[in-house]
Amino acid sequence: MELNPETLKKAYNYLSKDDCLNHFIIKFSDVIDITERYSVNYAKALADLIIEQQVSFKAAITIKKRFSDLISNLSNNEILELKLEMLQSVGISYRKAEYIRNVYMYFQESKYDFNSSSNEDVISELISIKGIGLWSAQMFLIFVLMR
């Protein structure tokens, strides 16, 4: 099943039957842009996953937007040349900035074929990147590779 505005609306309708979930749908559905959930640029998608960890949903949205604005016209190589302080200036912690740099470095050097690899192999490959753990690798499989 493809995730698009129509399927998202169906999901909202179904999930809104639960009072607790309905609360979150009402509170956050207007800030969720399904077209920008995760980038097809794998490095950017993993950077977004790193940003989302251990911050509130609302904070993650704000920081991801600032990060996207910062790198929007930059190549991966130019992103790697950014000082960690520049990444921190958009709300990313020093440690997460290091991990994001590791991700971009990996994709600068690697030609790994994620699409033709098994789930287990993709997870093994991703967790070899410092800063990417099992949870991030599994979220990458689900939301980016749609598996």
Locations of regions flagged by a protein language model:
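Catalytic DNA-binding helix-loop module of base-excision-repair DNA glycosylases/AP lyases
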Residues: 118-147
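N-terminal polyanion-binding entry modules of DNA glycosylases/AP lyases
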Residues: 1-117, 121
